[in-house]
């Protein structure tokens, strides 16, 4: 299972079963922070507690399979190379924070990677459930299945007044972080994204880049997530975030039509230039690749550029990341110039199909 996860550009859950109309929403994610009752939190770095949590996680494979019918595997991070761990971060299957802490850290992963449980990160467990497109409710329902299967065998640290107890006070309560990853090229291109982000933050939500906190919104890809976990139910959190995202989708569509109406030829020029560069360039760095791939996806959505596969944008975003690229090519000793050359070649091959 590990080889499949590391070698495949897209996890099975991220592939679209039906034709997406405008590829604005890339994916939905639910994350539940949980700690076991009676054990010191991970940030205390208590070896005995870390060992116990690790042992509990290794015994979860059969109960989880019974809960949702998927096969589960346990992946010890200590047994992975640095580049393999970096690929898991690039694929959003592991947090950068977990990559930095190795002893007693592991992942419990479903066969389609729609469920990933990070063990001994900031909390004992971070249960992550993912789905393609805007499917927060589906992702949440799956997370609850897993959550209940674990809690049925190993009680969580829970307080009647405060809710689920977590290492960081900002997660206390529901322990729920719901997030949606969106591709917003027209809002970015028009400059309207700055004002929109300000409005979203004022409503109590966070806006981050492709790789979460502190990351840049490369390729016009943004993550929108809730911040409040106390005084609000899980259902209300999901309902409110869904409404926020639906509003963002409407604004992106409006911006696309505005760009077409105000200067269609200018827009076509930008999109065709990006297409031309990636069709013929011999070296492309990661940032330029994402920027121009974003332009091409917008051009495909607006029927300005030739159509490409329904998952091509997501595949190329994954393949052109530096760590996955070296894994994809089977060579971890590539120079930066080598990476830029191979990145350009991979993109040219995709565009020629």
How would you label these PLM feature ranges?
Residues 1-161, 176, 190, 195-197, ...:
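Long, Pro/Ser/Thr-rich low-complexity/intrinsically disordered regulatory tracts in eukaryotic proteins
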Residues 180-186:
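Alpha-helical support elements that line or immediately flank enzyme active sites
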């Amino acid at each position: 299972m590990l080889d499949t996860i590391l070698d495949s550009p897209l996890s099975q859950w991220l592939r679209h079963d039906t034709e997406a109309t405008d590829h604005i929403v890339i994916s939905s994610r639910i994350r539940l922070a949980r700690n076991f009752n009676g054990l010191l939190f991970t940030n205390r770095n208590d070896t005995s507690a870390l060992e116990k949590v690790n042992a509990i996680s290794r015994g979860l494979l059969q109960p989880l399979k019974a809960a949702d019918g998927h096969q589960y595997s346990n992946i010890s991070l200590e047994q992975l190379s640095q580049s393999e761990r970096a690929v898991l971060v690039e694929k959003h299957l592991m947090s950068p924070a977990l990559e930095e802490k190795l002893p007693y850290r592991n992942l419990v992963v479903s066969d389609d990677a729609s469920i990933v449980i990070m063990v001994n990160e900031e909390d004992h467990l971070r249960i992550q459930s993912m789905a393609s497109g805007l499917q927060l409710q589906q992702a949440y329902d799956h997370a609850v299945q897993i959550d209940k299967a674990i809690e049925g065998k190993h009680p969580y640290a829970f307080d009647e007044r405060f809710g689920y107890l977590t290492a960081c006070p900002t997660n206390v309560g529901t322990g729920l972080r719901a997030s949606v990853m969106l591709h917003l090229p027209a809002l970015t291109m028009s400059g309207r994204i700055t004002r929109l982000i300000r409005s979203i933050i004022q409503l109590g939500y966070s806006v981050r880049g492709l790789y979460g906190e502190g990351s840049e919104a490369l390729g016009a890809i943004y993550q929108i997530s809730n911040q409040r976990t106390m005084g609000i139910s899980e259902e209300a959190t999901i309902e409110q975030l869904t409404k926020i995202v639906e509003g963002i989708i409407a604004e992106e569509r409006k911006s696309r039509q505005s760009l077409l109406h105000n200067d269609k030829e200018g827009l076509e020029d930008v999109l065709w230039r990006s297409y031309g560069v990636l069709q013929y360039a011999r070296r492309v760095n990661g940032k330029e690749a994402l920027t121009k791939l974003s332009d091409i996806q917008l051009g495909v959505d607006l029927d300005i550029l030739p159509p490409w596969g329904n998952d091509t944008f997501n595949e190329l975003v994954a393949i052109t990341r530096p760590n996955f690229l070296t894994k994809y090519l089977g060579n971890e000793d590539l120079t930066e110039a080598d990476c830029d050359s191979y990145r350009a070649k991979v993109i040219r091959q995709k565009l020629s199909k």
